[in-house]
A protein has these predicted regions:
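Intrinsically disordered, glycine/charged-rich C-terminal tails and inter-domain linkers
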Residues: 21, 65-66, 71, 91, ...
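Right-handed parallel beta-helix
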Residues: 1-49
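Short, charged low-complexity intrinsically disordered segments located at boundaries
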Residues: 15-16, 20-21, 54, 97, ...
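C-terminal accessory segments
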Residues: 155-216
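Glycine-rich, flexible loop segments associated with nucleotide phosphate handling
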Residues: 13-22, 98-105, 130, 195-197
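Predominantly extracellular beta-rich ligand-binding scaffolds that present long acidic/polar faces
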Residues: 33, 42-173
Length: 217
């Protein structure tokens, strides 16, 4: 597990978060792939896969920017009831839940797995938070996470199989027929390191970037 947290150690809840940059990394076969609490993280070109509970957790607020990541949870060794992606914006101080602002941007990412719902949020004050999912391929149960009526989900591909080459063998390259190919937004490639994928291949290879960490060659 990559764990990053800064809550209550100095007696202040939700003060200026600490910075962590994760790029071109593969995280797999953990209980939780990425666990962040009141932190500041940028994550580019990462593959988080096959975790016993959560793929990525962003809790107790914080500032997070995720671009060109593949979060794919096909854990098969026991039953999993938790989603691949979870976020919340509060901490309990022993008396009540205290809101900590959550700012999260998810661009050109896959969030998928073998559960019906792979994105969940538990927000104390959603109007005080900012979050967006742009040009992402996601798996959700509308009864749990009604993305169709949440403006923060922009140009998302819902419940379309990303068609990985062989996720059972951790091969998360896209098949030729994947809906994620050329489905990203090139305007979201805002830093030079996004011009190549996790394997160092040029991005984009086609008319637009693929939605994922691995660009289809």
């Amino acid at each position: 597990c990559v764990q990053a947290e800064d809550v209550q150690y100095d007696g202040t809840i939700g003060d200026a978060p600490t910075q962590l940059n994760i790029s071109n990394s593969a995280i797999r076969n953990m209980t939780v792939g990425l666990l962040a609490r009141s932190f500041q993280i940028t994550a580019y070109n990462n593959i988080i896969s096959d975790c016993k509970s959560y793929g990525a957790v962003f809790s107790q607020g914080g500032n997070y920017t995720l671009k060109q990541n593949t979060i794919a949870n096909y854990w098969r060794y026991s039953q999993r009831s938790t989603p691949a992606f979870f976020m919340n914006d509060f901490v309990n101080d022993g008396t009540a839940n205290v809101h900590i602002p959550l700012n999260i941007t998810v661009d050109n990412c896959i969030i998928y797995g073998n559960n019906d719902n792979e994105i969940e949020k538990d927000l104390l004050d959603s109007l005080a938070d900012t979050y967006s999912f742009r040009n992402c391929l996601i798996k959700v149960d509308e009864k749990v996470t009604p993305v169709s009526v949440i403006p923060a989900f922009i140009n998302t591909f819902k419940n379309q199989d990303p068609q990985f080459e062989d996720y059972a063998k951790y091969d998360f390259r896209l098949k030729d027929t994947s809906p994620a190919i050329d489905a990203g937004d090139g305007a979201l490639l805002t830093v030079p390191e996004l011009n190549t994928d996790i394997d160092g291949n040029i991005r984009p290879q086609g008319a637009a970037p693929d939605i994922c960490a691995l660009e289809k060659k």
